[in-house]
């Protein structure tokens, strides 16, 4: 059955717009939206969980002006190597997520996430440092000063 989603090499149930750069070994789950219309680079070895949406454009100004502002805003998204995006996370235009970062399920990423950082919530906020030691991974809580 044809569901109307253009074919792509990652997942038959992922909607990929434009021509994003996706590194080797990256896994893309079902029901994802990868918007490459404003420039999207996803590094190697990432997991983009089911239901993740990554946007590189916004039609807010066009919409609220009744189309008096005809432009669609666009800004690239950059995702580093070995980044995990949890189920149903949303990444908004203009964001950079550093290498080995972890974004929790349902998080909405509106600003940059540093490398090796766990970010959760709406909006996504850094809560822990990701420490990788061989095959072991641990999350070291950040001090509350990060939220001020």
Question: Language-model segments: which ranges?
Answer:
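Beta-rich strand-turn-strand
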Residues: 87-111
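Short glycine-rich donor-binding/catalytic loop of glycosyltransferases
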Residues: 106-107, 112-114, 124, 130-131
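A transmembrane-helix-recognition feature enriched in membrane-embedded lipid enzymes
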Residues: 1-8
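Acidic/histidine-enriched, glycine/proline-rich intrinsically disordered or flexible terminal extensions
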Residues: 135-148
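Flexible, glycine/small-residue-enriched loop-and-beta-strand segment within the central core
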Residues: 9-22, 28-96, 122-123, 128-138
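Conserved active-site beta-strand element of glycosyltransferases/polysaccharide synthases
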Residues: 119
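Outer-envelope exported proteins of Gram-negative bacteria
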Residues: 43-45, 49, 100-106, 116
């Amino acid at each position: 059955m044809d569901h109307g989603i253009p074919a792509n090499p990652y997942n038959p149930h992922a909607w990929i717009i434009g021509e994003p750069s996706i590194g080797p070994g990256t896994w893309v789950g079902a029901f994802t939206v990868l918007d490459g219309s404003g420039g999207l680079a996803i590094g190697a070895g990432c997991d983009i969980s089911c239901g993740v949406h990554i946007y590189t454009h916004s039609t807010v100004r066009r919409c609220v002006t009744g189309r008096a502002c005809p432009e669609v805003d666009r800004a690239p998204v950059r995702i580093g190597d070995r980044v995990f995006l949890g189920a149903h996370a949303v990444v908004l235009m203009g964001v950079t997520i550093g290498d080995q970062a972890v974004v929790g399920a349902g998080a909405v990423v509106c600003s940059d996430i540093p490398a090796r950082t766990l970010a959760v919530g709406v909006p996504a906020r850094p809560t822990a440092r990701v420490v990788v030691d061989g095959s072991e991974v641990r999350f070291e809580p950040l001090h509350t000063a990060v939220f001020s």
